[in-house]
C-alpha cells in the first residue's frame, strides 16, 4: 500500500505515543511482538539491527496505555520515503486504537524525513486501518501459508485447502 507524502495528524485517544529511545523501550516492543505472535521475548534484539536503530535509520514507535506498551510501529527511512516495516498490537489492546495511535504518531513525527510518502505491505487484518490512514492499495497481496488453525487462516485472509 502507498500513502502520498502529505501531512498526517497523530490520532487522538487514550494512548500516549513515544519514539523508542532506550533499550528498555525495545524490550517493551519485544513484549508486544511476543504477545501478538507467541514469539521469543528477545526477538527485537535478534531480528532488528540495533546499530541501525541507534543510527536512526530504523525508528520504533510505541503506543502506551499507562505503563503497558500496547502497540508498536517500526519505520525505516531512505531516499525521502518511509517504509512501515512492521506493526504489532498486543491482543488485549486490539480494537482500541493502539495501532492507529502508534502509526499515525510515528508518521506525523517523521514527516520531514519522508516527504515522498510511505509504503507498506498490508495483511488483510491490517488493511482497513491503513486505508483509514490514507494508504491506497497498489496491488493486492495473496498470502500463501502451510498449515494453521481456521482462525489463524481467517486472520490473514487465506482459505483452508
Indicate residue ranges for each PLM-predicted region:
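Helix-loop element at the rim of GNAT/NAT acetyltransferase active sites that forms part
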Residues: 32-43
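Actinobacteria-biased recognition of intrinsically disordered, low-complexity terminal regions
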Residues: 153-161
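Acyl-donor-binding surface of acyltransferase catalytic domains
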Residues: 1-24, 120-122, 142-146
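An amphipathic alpha-helix signature
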Residues: 26-31
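Conserved GNAT acetyl-CoA-binding A-motif
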Residues: 110-122
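A conserved beta-strand-loop-helix scaffold within acyl/acetyltransferase catalytic domains
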Residues: 41-90
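Conserved acetyl-CoA-binding loop-helix of GNAT-fold acetyltransferases
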Residues: 86-91, 95-110, 132
Amino acid at each position: 500500500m502507498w500513502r502520498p507524502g502529505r501531512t498526517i495528524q497523530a490520532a487522538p485517544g487514550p494512548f500516549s505515543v513515544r519514539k523508542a529511545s532506550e533499550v528498555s523501550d525495545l524490550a517493551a516492543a519485544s513484549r508486544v511482538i511476543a504477545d501478538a505472535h507467541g514469539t521469543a521475548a528477545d526477538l527485537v534484539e535478534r531480528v532488528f539491527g540495533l546499530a541501525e536503530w541507534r543510527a536512526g535509520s530504523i525508528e520504533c514507535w510505541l503506543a502506551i496505555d499507562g505503563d503497558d506498551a500496547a502497540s508498536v510501529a517500526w519505520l525505516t527511512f531512505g531516499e525521502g520515503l518511509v517504509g512501515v516495516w512492521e506493526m504489532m498490537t498486543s491482543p488485549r489492546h486490539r480494537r482500541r486504537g493502539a495501532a492507529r495511535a502508534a502509526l499515525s504518531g510515528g508518521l506525523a513525527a517523521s514527516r520531514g524525513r519522508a516527504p515522498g510518502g510511505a509504503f507498506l505491505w498490508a495483511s488483510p487484518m491490517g488493511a482497513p486501518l491503513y486505508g483509514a490512514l490514507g494508504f491506497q492499495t497498489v496491488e493486492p497481496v495473496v498470502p500463501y501459508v502451510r498449515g494453521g488453525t481456521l482462525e489463524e487462516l481467517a486472520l490473514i485472509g487465506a482459505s483452508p485447502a
